[in-house]
From Swiss-Prot:
<dbReference type="GO" id="GO:0009381">
    <property type="term" value="F:excinuclease ABC activity"/>
</dbReference>
<dbReference type="InterPro" id="IPR001943">
    <property type="entry name" value="UVR_dom"/>
</dbReference>
<dbReference type="Pfam" id="PF04851">
    <property type="entry name" value="ResIII"/>
</dbReference>
<dbReference type="InterPro" id="IPR014001">
    <property type="entry name" value="Helicase_ATP-bd"/>
</dbReference>
<comment type="function">
    <text>The UvrABC repair system catalyzes the recognition and processing of DNA lesions. A damage recognition complex composed of 2 UvrA and 2 UvrB subunits scans DNA for abnormalities. Upon binding of the UvrA(2)B(2) complex to a putative damaged site, the DNA wraps around one UvrB monomer. DNA wrap is dependent on ATP binding by UvrB and probably causes local melting of the DNA helix, facilitating insertion of UvrB beta-hairpin between the DNA strands. Then UvrB probes one DNA strand for the presence of a lesion.</text>
</comment>
<dbReference type="GO" id="GO:0016887">
    <property type="term" value="F:ATP hydrolysis activity"/>
</dbReference>
<dbReference type="GO" id="GO:0009380">
    <property type="term" value="C:excinuclease repair complex"/>
</dbReference>
<keyword id="KW-0547">Nucleotide-binding</keyword>
<dbReference type="Pfam" id="PF00271">
    <property type="entry name" value="Helicase_C"/>
</dbReference>
<dbReference type="Pfam" id="PF12344">
    <property type="entry name" value="UvrB"/>
</dbReference>
<dbReference type="GO" id="GO:0009432">
    <property type="term" value="P:SOS response"/>
</dbReference>
<protein>
    <recommendedName>
        <fullName>UvrABC system protein B</fullName>
    </recommendedName>
</protein>
<feature type="domain" description="Helicase ATP-binding">
    <location>
        <begin position="24"/>
        <end position="409"/>
    </location>
</feature>
<dbReference type="InterPro" id="IPR024759">
    <property type="entry name" value="UvrB_YAD/RRR_dom"/>
</dbReference>
<dbReference type="GO" id="GO:0005524">
    <property type="term" value="F:ATP binding"/>
</dbReference>
<dbReference type="InterPro" id="IPR027417">
    <property type="entry name" value="P-loop_NTPase"/>
</dbReference>
<keyword id="KW-0227">DNA damage</keyword>
Length: 657
């Protein structure tokens, strides 16, 4: 099946040329290209057109979950008849295993897996293995190790009507595929009822598989509603994929156990003069081996991943990228931020594991349960398009001149030319600008501060003046950041103050003023690239205005002014030539079910009275249901609050006994 693009508008401005050049580059085997597109020029629409033109399996890589979810929603709308999937880390909460030698403190791994995201991850791998019309939007989670595609596909169960499947062997196979027997219809489960077996695939929530038998002969396969089991479609055959990426064929498991034991013996010899570490590594690893023998799984099994893939020490881990065919298209969105993030992942992982291995908590093979290094990731960059308004030196060099500019905005709105005002007295001046915007135009304001503390203080100061304001920085969790952005667009707040508001991939047409405090403090967040990105946040509004509060013109400010003037003039010339009058962007407030906070959701609150045993048990059930619903809708922060409230109730319950 081919990609079928659905869009209510046709390419315009720079888009037709950008689409044609990028598509030709992919077809002509150009390894790296850059789409240098200004904010609001329709880069996502351009990429969607390229995907439809070249018709290749595609991975879109974003640098955070918020942006990934926005892109996922947009591509689903562009390709409603194709497999658009979502692949991010499935942890609502994750505390990695660690050992702090100076205090002799071992921290056990603690996590909470989001069931809905786990389903979407499995759906993504299933789609890319079955269909070429697959587009997966992913965070950098795609460079972390998961089970090998060879093991995953070898454990898939192919079912055909008319063939014999001894029931005891079939159910045993389902258990090996990480499906559990359960009378309740739930994901990754199966149930037997007389001559019928119902299977609830790990990667589906809308369909169940009903198998009917005559003795051991499979007589019918039906896709059914998972709750009512009303048939939807009868098929002659079906393929059921495993319930986990970490399934292990029996022959490979036996071989892996042998190599783990060999590594254990080597490590015990290494610790011969350190009895504590020797005893520790022996007991921990032996326990894991016994668990793998008995149930095919153990806690922390990913630390033995090299043994299950048969790879040599130091070899790259298998990851989502290995599930794609050789000719896949890679789109790296906001590449100026995503590429540095890929570089950073490996170093942080290795430093944490060093002490675990050194003190006998893990075998050295645990080092190979890791993300790809940047150099390893580059081997997958066979057909890549870097997308950014401010591409870095890496992308420019890699593309060897294959840079496609997309400066023209379909709306006709030119880049606002920044005004430079003194940093002395900047808060008072900004306050006047805010009041002017709110009293006359009811428009929104972004303020860029130099520190988190200043952002928090500024938000508090404005709130005291009865100006609805909030701050946004890295200390706020993903889902809460998303809610704050929604609040800004919907009018709950009018002013948003942050340190690095670039990282959100902000698409806020209501913002008409961007004010950058201390713009002359040269550095990472006041570089040319950052300043241009900040300016772009006001370029979606017809009344867009940018103010740099600076006592001197730094080199970054001067370069930003020159580049802004260049882009502005291109847009103005285009508008004049085509008689275009700038018009505002009318965009619905983002209603992605993955991120949207339900209006009827309940916030966990402290009880106003002592609770009885029955009250606490009822509260636990309520919070668990709310947690699961919030997690299913990707409201991560809310889910975590419900989890904490549920845990608090459980702890209170203990004191009643």
């Amino acid at each position: 099946m081919t990609f079928q693009l659905h869009a209510p508008f046709a390419p315009c401005g720079d888009q037709p040329e950008a689409i044609a050049r990028l598509s030709a580059g992919v077809r002509n085997q150009v390894k790296s290209q850059v789409l240098l597109g200004t904010t609001g020029s329709g880069k996502t629409f351009t990429i969607a057109n390229v995907v439809a033109n070249v018709n290749l399996p595609t991975l879109v890589l974003a640098h955070n979950k918020t942006l990934a979810a926005q892109l996922y929603q947009e591509f689903r709308e562009f390709f409603p008849n194709n497999a658009v999937e979502y692949f991010i880390s499935y942890y609502d909460y994750y505390q990695p295993e660690a050992y702090i030698a100076r205090s002799d403190t071992y921290i056990e791994k603690s996590l909470l897996i989001n069931d809905e995201i786990d389903k979407l991850r499995l759906s993504a791998t299933r789609s890319i293995l079955e269909r070429r019309d697959t587009l997966i939007v992913s965070s950098v989670s795609c460079i972390y190790g998961i089970g090998s595609p060879e093991n995953y596909t070898s454990m898939a169960l192919v079912l055909e009507v008319g063939k014999e499947y001894p029931r005891n062997i079939l159910t045993a196979q389902l258990v090996k595929m990480h499906y559990q027997a359960s009378p309740i219809p739930q994901r990754s489960a199966f149930r037997e009822r007389g001559s019928v077996i119902d299977i609830f695939p790990a990667y589906e929530s809308e369909l169940a598989l009903r198998l009917e038998f005559l003795n051991d002969t499979l007589t019918s396969i039906e896709y059914s509603d998972p709750l009512t089991m009303i048939p939807k479609e009868s098929v002659p055959s079906a393929t059921l994929y495993p319930g986990s990426h970490y399934v292990i064929p029996e022959a490979i498991r036996e071989q892996a156990i042998r190599t783990i034991q060999e590594e254990l013996e080597e490590r015990m010899a290494f610790f011969d003069d350190r009895p504590i570490e020797k005893d520790r590594i022996f007991h921990r690893t032996t326990h894991d081996i016994e668990m793998i023998k008995e149930i095919g799984f153990c806690k922390g099994i990913e630390n033995y991943s090299r043994h299950f893939t048969g790879a040599p020490p130091g070899a790259p881990p298998t990851c989502l990228l290995d599930y794609f065919p050789e000719d896949f298209l890679l789109i790296i969105d906001e590449s100026h931020q995503t590429l540095p993030q890929i570089r950073a992942m490996y170093r942080g992982d290795q430093s944490r594991k060093q002490s675990l291995v050194e003190y006998g908590f893990r075998l050295p093979s645990a080092f190979d349960n890791r993300p790809l290094t940047y150099e390893e990731a580059q081997k997958y960059f066979r057909k890549v398009i870097y997308v950014s308004a401010t591409p870095g030196d890496t992308e420019v060099q890699e593309s060897s001149g294959h840079i496609v500019q997309q400066i023209i905005r379909p709306t006709g709105i030119p880049d606002p030319m920044p005004e430079i005002r003194p940093a002395t007295g900047q808060v008072d001046d900004l306050l006047e600008e805010i009041r002017l915007r709110l009293s006359q135009k009811h428009e929104k304001i972004l303020v860029i501060s130099i520190t988190k503390k200043l952002a928090e203080d500024m938000a508090g100061f404005l709130s005291e003046l009865e100006i609805p304001a909030a701050y946004l920085h890295s200390g706020i969790e993903t889902a809460e950041r998303t809610q704050i952005l929604t609040d800004l667009r919907s009018g709950v707040i009018d002013v948003l103050i942050g340190v690095n508001l670039l990282r959100e991939g902000l698409d806020l047409p209501e913002v008409s003023l961007v004010a950058i405090l201390d713009a002359d403090k040269e550095g990472f967040l006041r570089s040319t690239s950052s300043l241009i990105q900040f300016c772009g946040r006001a370029a979606r509004n017809i009344n867009g205005k940018v103010i740099f509060y600076a006592d001197q013109k730094t080199r970054s400010i001067e370069e930003t002014l020159r580049e802004t003037e260049r882009r502005r003039q291109i847009q103005l010339d285009y508008n004049k030539e085509h008689n275009i009058v700038p018009k505002p962007i009318i965009k619905a407030i983002f209603a992605n079910p993955i991120l949207q906070t339900s209006k009827d959701s309940e916030s966990p609150k402290e009880s106003q009275r002592p609770l009885s045993k029955e009250d606490l048990e009822e509260q636990i059930k309520k919070y668990e249901a709310l947690m699961q619903r919030a997690a299913k809708e990707f409201r991560f922060n809310e889910a975590a609050k419900y989890r904490d409230a549920m845990q608090a109730c459980k702890e209170q319950l203990l004191y009643l006994f």
